Amino acid sequence: MAAKKVVKQIKLQVEAGKANPAPPVGPALGQAGLNIMEFCKQFNERSKAQIGLKLPVVITVFSDRSFTFITKSPPAALLVKKAIGLETGSATPHTHKVGKITRKQLEEIAKTKMEDLNANDIDAAVNIIAGTCRSMGVTVEA
């Protein structure tokens, strides 16, 4: 049997456990001709352990209208905001600082994100997350 032909890849950010046919999920999957409810059921089942977080998901659509999807770890900015209790980052990050984060907190976030980051070890991953913090107006403590 020949491999299925990939027609399209759809990238979305959906709140864990709360996928429903309303936008943004419905229109994106409807255009590809997928069964929206089937995706919602599978996604909600897979992501129920991470409720409350927005998860990036990559949906691969095949020529026979079947699909597979991969859920990734939450965005680093979301994890940073959650770790230090922020609502939003700074509008002017270099002049107005909105919070502080410790190296230990950075390491926890880096461990969570490690599989999705382009880093070889935990120190490189921590540096990537620290860069995200700086661009949000969060001071990184040594």
Curated annotation (Swiss-Prot):
Keyword Ribonucleoprotein in annotation: yes
Leader peptide range in chain numbering: none
PROSITE patterns: RIBOSOMAL_L11
Changes after translation: One or more lysine residues are methylated.
Coiled-coil stretches: none
CDD domains reported for this sequence: Ribosomal_L11
Cellular component GO terms, alphabetical: cytosolic large ribosomal subunit
A Pfam family recorded for this sequence: Ribosomal_L11
Task of the protein: Forms part of the ribosomal stalk which helps the ribosome interact with GTP-bound translation factors.
Record-stated family: Belongs to the universal ribosomal protein uL11 family.
NCBIfam families per record: L11_bact
Protein name: Large ribosomal subunit protein uL11
Species per Swiss-Prot/TrEMBL record: Leptospira interrogans serogroup Icterohaemorrhagiae serovar Lai (strain 56601)
Lineage: Bacteria, Pseudomonadati, Spirochaetota, Spirochaetia, Leptospirales
